């Protein structure tokens, strides 16, 4: 999704070496004026993300849509692609509702628990910029763990 948190997050991630693809089904949120730093911007059907982008085992996916149903569509498709990282933004209730639907679809509890829900590190973030910072921190940490460079200071 291309909402307020994503608008804060993408510049941070690009600045620290991530390549960002933004997808939203609303052109008002998915356009070069909103995301000038994004490598690619996609306006498309969130029920068919595979038609627009290929997700693989080296990818990080941040799911930040505007509602339960869209989170469900995206998380269901993303889990099937087995990326390195999946993070889902939302309240505990929203996350529980989506997780229950995924379980009923046949995804295992282990698969669902691989997802970082809620996305980001627990820093007491409240504003979109603070939430984006907590997400960027989590992604940097996961990248460091993957490359063997993670050390707790």
Model-identified regions with their sequence ranges:
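Hydrophobic, well-ordered beta-alpha structural blocks that scaffold small-molecule cofactor pockets
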Residues: 2-57, 70-71
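Short, glycine/charged-enriched secondary-structure capping and boundary segments
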Residues: 13, 35-37, 75-78, 101-103
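Preference for short coil/turn "hinge" residues that link or interrupt alpha-helices
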Residues: 22, 28, 39-42, 48, ...
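ADP-ribose/adenylate-binding Rossmann-like module
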Residues: 23, 60, 65, 76-101
């Amino acid at each position: 999704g291309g909402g307020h948190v994503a608008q804060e997050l993408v510049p941070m991630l690009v600045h620290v070496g991530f390549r960002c693809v933004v997808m939203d089904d609303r052109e008002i949120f998915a356009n070069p004026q909103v995301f000038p730093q994004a490598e690619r911007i996609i306006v498309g059907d969130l029920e068919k993300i595979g038609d627009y982008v290929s997700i693989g085992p080296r990818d990080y996916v941040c799911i930040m849509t505007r509602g339960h149903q869209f989170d469900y569509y995206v998380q269901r498709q993303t889990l099937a692609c087995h990326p390195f990282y999946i993070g889902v933004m939302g309240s505990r209730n929203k996350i529980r509702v989506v997780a229950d639907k995924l379980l009923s679809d046949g995804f295992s509890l282990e698969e669902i628990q691989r997802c970082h829900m809620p996305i980001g590190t627990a820093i007491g973030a409240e504003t979109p910029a603070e939430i984006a910072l907590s997400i960027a921190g989590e992604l940097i940490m996961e990248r460091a763990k993957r490359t063997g460079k993670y050390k707790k200071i």
